[in-house]
Structure formats: structure tokens, C-alpha cells
UniProtKB/Swiss-Prot annotation:
<dbReference type="InterPro" id="IPR044179">
    <property type="entry name" value="PPR5-like"/>
</dbReference>
<comment type="similarity">
    <text>Belongs to the PPR family. P subfamily.</text>
</comment>
<dbReference type="InterPro" id="IPR002885">
    <property type="entry name" value="Pentatricopeptide_rpt"/>
</dbReference>
<protein>
    <recommendedName>
        <fullName>Pentatricopeptide repeat-containing protein At2g48000</fullName>
    </recommendedName>
</protein>
<dbReference type="GO" id="GO:0003729">
    <property type="term" value="F:mRNA binding"/>
</dbReference>
<dbReference type="Pfam" id="PF01535">
    <property type="entry name" value="PPR"/>
</dbReference>
<feature type="repeat" description="PPR 5">
    <location>
        <begin position="292"/>
        <end position="324"/>
    </location>
</feature>
<keyword id="KW-0677">Repeat</keyword>
<dbReference type="InterPro" id="IPR011990">
    <property type="entry name" value="TPR-like_helical_dom_sf"/>
</dbReference>
<feature type="repeat" description="PPR 4">
    <location>
        <begin position="257"/>
        <end position="287"/>
    </location>
</feature>
<feature type="repeat" description="PPR 1">
    <location>
        <begin position="147"/>
        <end position="181"/>
    </location>
</feature>
<feature type="repeat" description="PPR 3">
    <location>
        <begin position="222"/>
        <end position="256"/>
    </location>
</feature>
<feature type="repeat" description="PPR 8">
    <location>
        <begin position="399"/>
        <end position="433"/>
    </location>
</feature>
<feature type="repeat" description="PPR 9">
    <location>
        <begin position="434"/>
        <end position="469"/>
    </location>
</feature>
<feature type="repeat" description="PPR 6">
    <location>
        <begin position="328"/>
        <end position="362"/>
    </location>
</feature>
<feature type="repeat" description="PPR 7">
    <location>
        <begin position="364"/>
        <end position="398"/>
    </location>
</feature>
<feature type="repeat" description="PPR 2">
    <location>
        <begin position="187"/>
        <end position="221"/>
    </location>
</feature>
Length: 481
């Protein structure tokens, strides 16, 4: 009963969040563990700048034509807070954002309309997202008024480009200037960036130290602070602290956001806690099914690693939510292996066909053994023979176990000619005969009346190669690989 009440309560909370978020895919893509500022939250109220929204729609129509973009901007003469709002709304289109920012920067240089610190901060952020760190640094130096938002923007640019040392050093420089003439001081967003930085580096003690410092400075943490802590614990596989942080949010002043629940879903999937994962998924199912392919992939992996009795059905259901064009190579291989272990030859061969069509190559023994074992258990020797030929043509790794499976299956059906042809195929693939290869031949012939001369031939070959063996009795059945 308690579990049912927890689930109902959770679904109720998430439903409210989904209503607030309006289900916008482009907005919710910003809900990563590394969001630093409140303005990047879908719950942030921008003031309803209709002018910026209308201008954004005009610019989107001409986003592939820099000349027309400039013409639209010239007609509207936008700057200051309205320009910052426009760049905020253009965030899902970084290339267009860069064109718009370049226009504003040129206006400042040519027409003497100085840019504000917030405009520079947006430009630095855009450059960071486009992996142009040099431009981001140039804009930082160009900004005469280095406010907290300007420092945060460059720290964020360093962070998203993997320049952790530069990010850390910039914070130290920023922090050391508090006693100088500048009145700018680190904000909660500054510390959020540091928490995210140390979380990515799996430096949990430093991450927690930054959070403690934040509290000692009486700076109130926000949802991004806790989300970045949770993300750090997920990186470090510290599931207890992940869950403790989540519960502290539920019981505290800063309540979980949709981003928090998505993080917890990932954490439960990674930890293999299927019960909690399924509860969390049901709560955010509508959003996840539409927008979160990576989370769906994480859940598929969680079921794959588990011994859940209904895992095949659940994996099949989840995989249908991913568009075929979005399938990653590893997902084809995982699904191939899942259906192989379930002896579902039709589904397995369907994914084999797709993998070959897409030019994927398998070089892993485990996957090949799973496929061969599935054909073996289903006694589908002709299908296995066809698969061997197709796998070879596709450049997949050929192993001795594949040919051993063919030999055993042909032998069990007394198709001796085809069984012996397998030996020739092995030679063509430069796969040598092992003791096991000869043992398979010996047992097949010994189990068949009238094949004593073949038994003697194989026994002679084994002695020639120095293999010890016991002559099997004729009554023995053909044994497995």
C-alpha cells in the first residue's frame, strides 16, 4: 500500500511538471545535468517578449541566408535586453544565433552602439556551443564590463569543450578579484558549473566541497545545483548518495524538476534498480517516449543486463519507440543477441539483415557464439549455413565454433558430405583444425553404423597430430560442441 501511495504521489508531481513544460522538445533538450542558469529552465518566465518571438520566427525563415538575416535585423533595430531575449529564444539554433550575434557585434564596432555585458555573455555561450573557444575567449577580453554572467559564460564554454583546467583556473581568477575594484562576485550559477565540472571528472569529494562552500557563503542552491550533484553521483556510481540527494529535494525547499526525474530514471537504469526505474518511467513516460531516446536506450540496456522474466517483451516494446533511423550500431547488436538467447530466429535474422544492410561489422566472439547457439538449439542447420556465408561476405569475424556447430548439426542429420565440406570451408578461411574438430568427426562417425573406416581415418589423423583420444563406442550419441 505504501509503495502504491508513493507511486501515485510521484505521478501527480510529474504530471504538474509536464503541464508546466508544455512538452516542448527543443526546450526540454536543455534539461541536462549541466544546466547552470535559471534562465535555461523551461519554468523560467522570460517576461513574454512578443517582439523577440516574432523576430525569431522571421529569422528562422531565412536561417540559411545570412544576407536576409541581416536585412531582417536591420529593419527591427533590436538591442539590449530585447536582443538578449532574442538570443535566448534562438538557443536551439546555434549557427543562426552566431549570425545574429555577429550582426550585433558589427553594429557595435561600426555604429558606436556598445554591447552590454549580457550580450557578450550570450555571444561567449554561443561560441562555446559551436566549439569555438578562441572566439569565446576573445569576446571575454573584448567585454569592458566583466560581470558575473560574463565569467559564467566563459566557464561554461570551457566546461562544454572539456577544458576543465581552464574552467577551474578562471574561477580562481574570478574569486580572487572580489577584493578589487570590480563588484562582481560568483553566483549560484558559478558554483553550479564547478559542481558539474567535478562531477564529470568523478571527483566526488571536490564536488561536495564546492556544495559545502556554497552553503557556507549563504548562497541558496537552486534545482540545477542539486541536479548537477545527482549527475555527479551517477557518474561515480554512488547510488545511495544519488537517492539521498533526490529525497533531500523532495523534502526541502528546492523541489525536483522534470530534469531531476529524468536524471533519477537514468540513475536507476544504470544501477539496475528495475523496480524504481519502472516507477520513475511510468511517471515521465509521456515525455520520455517522445523526447528521450538516450533514456530509452539506457532502459533497454538495464533489461538486457537483468534476469527479468519479462525482459524480452519489455525490450521489444521500448525498441519500437526509437525510430529505425536513430538506431545505433550497438543497439542492433544488442537486440540481435537478445533474440538469439530467446531463440526467436525470425526477429534475430531481421536484425542480422538490417545490420548487414547498414554495413555493420561484428568482431565480437560472444555475439557470434550466441547466434550460432540459437541456430543449434533450433536445429536450423541450413539457416546456419546461410548465415555463415552472409557473415563472411559482410566481413564479420569468422570463428571455429561456427564451423563446429555446422559439423555437429550436419552429423546429427547424417549429412556426411556436407559435414566434410565444412572442413574445406575452414581451410579457405585459414581456420585450422583443432583437436575438438577431429573429436566431433570421430563421435559423428562412431555413432553411425557402417562408418568404421572413417573412424579409423580420423583416429589416424589425431595420432598424427599428437592428440590423445579414447575411441568412442558406436552406441554413443553425437555430443554437443
Amino acid at each position: 500500500m505504501k509503495k502504491r501511495m508513493w507511486r501515485i504521489s510521484l505521478i501527480s508531481q510529474i504530471s504538474d511538471l509536464l503541464c508546466l513544460s508544455r512538452g516542448s522538445s527543443s526546450t526540454l533538450k536543455t534539461l541536462t545535468p549541466f544546466c547552470f542558469t535559471l534562465s535555461r529552465s523551461p519554468f523560467h518566465q522570460s517576461g513574454g517578449d512578443d517582439d523577440a518571438s516574432g523576430l525569431k520566427n522571421q529569422l528562422l525563415r531565412f536561417r540559411n541566408d545570412s544576407g536576409k538575416v541581416a536585412s531582417v535585423l536591420e529593419r527591427n533595430k533590436i538591442q539590449g535586453a530585447a536582443f538578449v531575449e532574442l538570443l535566448r529564444q534562438l538557443r536551439p539554433w546555434p549557427v543562426l544565433s552566431q549570425l545574429v550575434f555577429d550582426w550585433r557585434r558589427n553594429k557595435a564596432l561600426c555604429d558606436g552602439l556598445p554591447m552590454t555585458a549580457d550580450e557578450y555573455a550570450k555571444g561567449i555561450t554561443i561560441s562555446g556551443r559551436l566549439k569555438n573557444v578562441d572566439l569565446a575567449l576573445s569576446l571575454f577580453h573584448e567585454s569592458a564590463n566583466k560581470t558575473t554572467s560574463v565569467y559564467n559564460a566563459l566557464m561554461g564554454a570551457y566546461l562544454c569543450n572539456g577544458l576543465s583546467h581552464h574552467c577551474e583556473q578562471l574561477f580562481l581568477d574570478f574569486n580572487s578579484q572580489q577584493d578589487g575594484p570590480s563588484s562582481s562576485t560568483p553566483s549560484v550559477s558559478t558554483y553550479n558549473i564547478l559542481i558539474s565540472l567535478y562531477g564529470r571528472l568523478i571527483m566526488v569529494e571536490r564536488m561536495e566541497s564546492v556544495f559545502l562552500q556554497l552553503q557556507q557563503l549563504n548562497i541558496l542552491p537552486d534545482s540545477s545545483t542539486y541536479n548537477n550533484l545527482i549527475a555527479g553521483y551517477i557518474y561515480a556510481w554512488d547510488w545511495d548518495k544519488m537517492e539521498a540527494t533526490f529525497h533531500s529535494m523532495k523534502n526541502g525547499l528546492v523541489k525536483p524538476t522534470l530534469a531531476t526525474y529524468l536524471l533519477m530514471l537514468r540513475g536507476y537504469a544504470n544501477s539496475g534498480n528495475l523496480l524504481r526505474m519502472e516507477d520513475m518511467y511510468q511517471a515521465v513516460k509521456r515525455h520520455v517516449d517522445r523526447n528521450e531516446i538516450k533514456l530509452i536506450e539506457s532502459m533497454i540496456c538495464a533489461y538486457y543486463r537483468s534476469c527479468h522474466k519479462d525482459r524480452i517483451r519489455k525490450i521489444k516494446t521500448l525498441s519500437k519507440l526509437i525510430p529505425k533511423k536513430s538506431y545505433k550500431p550497438w543497439l542492433y547488436l544488442l537486440l540481435m543477441q537478445v533474440y538469439a538467447k530467446d531463440d526467436n530466429l525470425h526477429a534475430m535474422e531481421n536484425f542480422i539483415d538490417q545490420a548487414i544492410t547498414k554495413g555493420l561489422q561484428i568482431e565480437t566472439d560472444g555475439i557470434m557464439r550466441s547466434i550460432v547457439a540459437s541456430y543449434f538449439r533450433c536445429n536450423a542447420v541450413d539457416k546456419l549455413a546461410k548465415f555463415v556465408q552472409r557473415a563472411n561476405s559482410a566481413g564479420w569475424k569468422m570463428s571455429r565454433s561456427m564451423f563446429h556447430g555446422l559439423m555437429i548439426m550436419y552429423g546429427s542429420q547424417k549429412r556426411f558430405k556436407e559435414m566434410e565440406n565444412v572442413l574445406s570451408e575452414m581451410e579457405s578461411f585459414k581456420i585450422s583444425r583443432s583437436k575438438k574438430t577431429l573429436c566431433i568427426l570421430l563421435r559423428v562417425y562412431a555413432a553411425t553404423h557402417g562408418q568404421e573406416h572413417k573412424v579409423n581415418q580420423v583416429a589416424g589423423m589425431m595420432l598424427k597430430h599428437g592428440h590423445d583420444f579414447q575411441r568412442p563406442e558406436a552406441s554413443k550419441r553425437v555430443m554437443g560442441k
